[in-house]
Amino acid sequence: MGSTMEPPGGAYLHLGAVTSPVGTARMLQLAFGCTTFSLVAHRGGFGGVQGTFCMAAWGFCFAFSVLVVACEFTRLHSCLRLSWGNFTAAFAMLATLLCATAAVIYPLYFTRLECPPEPAGCMVRNFRLAASVFAGLLFLAYAAEVALTRARPGQVASYMATVSGLLKIVQAFVACIIFGALVHESRYGRYVATQWCVAVYSLCFMATVAVVVLSVMGHTGGLGCPFDRLVVVYTFLAVLLYLSAAVIWPVFCFDPKYGEPGRPSDCPRGSCPWDSQLVVAIFTYVNLLLYIVDLAYSQRIRFVPTL
């Protein structure tokens, strides 16, 4: 009789991918994501830019969660030319932010306690309430994965699992919010100073994305200089650049000499330049704070690029 050979790396299927605490969180992500998407698509309904964003966010997160679980369960991630630990940590943080945003937007724009006037209004309301609940649970499931996989003090970990790595995802996400406000009637082209602020946002965003991509692709070791040192230098420069934007943008948007100190009474809701300028100012300070915290943590991290 012939004999069977054991696979050299152990069992072909990795049961821990679905039974470990992280695996359990990922299975909950799949369950909650599918439920939320189905409730909205079946009867809850959506519309406009806000609803499209929510559906796109849930669909994106569900698709990539399926990919992560499948690759972990079948061990196929070892065949991919990327740093799997960095990829999963970065995706979990991005999914947490996307699902948190969708969990706020969908109830805010589509959920009401009273029944709509149409014949099936109460059923639609119930589906939307249920979708809002599961959207919140989906956010918690992704946040749980981030908490479980985050690098602890003294632990050997990939860069994206460290506080500094996770903050890179948040910084890029906040920059996208700033860009969204800039293109929405912000009038940033009126002054050279505000154009400088846009250049700051763009430069820091591209550099942050480059750090994330290099980490996920596992190419941080071939830069000719220690990657952690480059990250610290870049983060310090980003703090200085954002500090300049945090001073310049409010002056040229809200000082009476250049802009409006208060919201004009005749400014139309939904297309008011002052509102967009305020959003940019708020999230400029948010990102400045994130870069300062990042700089503080970057001084102490030690990571393994190939994990």
UniProtKB/Swiss-Prot annotation:
PROSITE patterns: MARVEL. Residues 17-154, 159-303 form the MARVEL domain. InterPro entries: Marvel, MYADM-like. One of its GO terms (cellular component) is cytoplasm. Its main location: membrane. It is a multi-pass membrane protein. It holds the Pfam family MARVEL. Keywords: Membrane, Repeat, Transmembrane, Transmembrane helix. The chain crosses the membrane at residues 53-73, 90-110, 129-149, 163-183, 198-218, 232-252, 278-298. It is found in: Membrane. Belongs to the MAL family. This is Myeloid-associated differentiation marker-like protein 2. It comes from Rattus norvegicus (Rat). The gene is Myadml2.
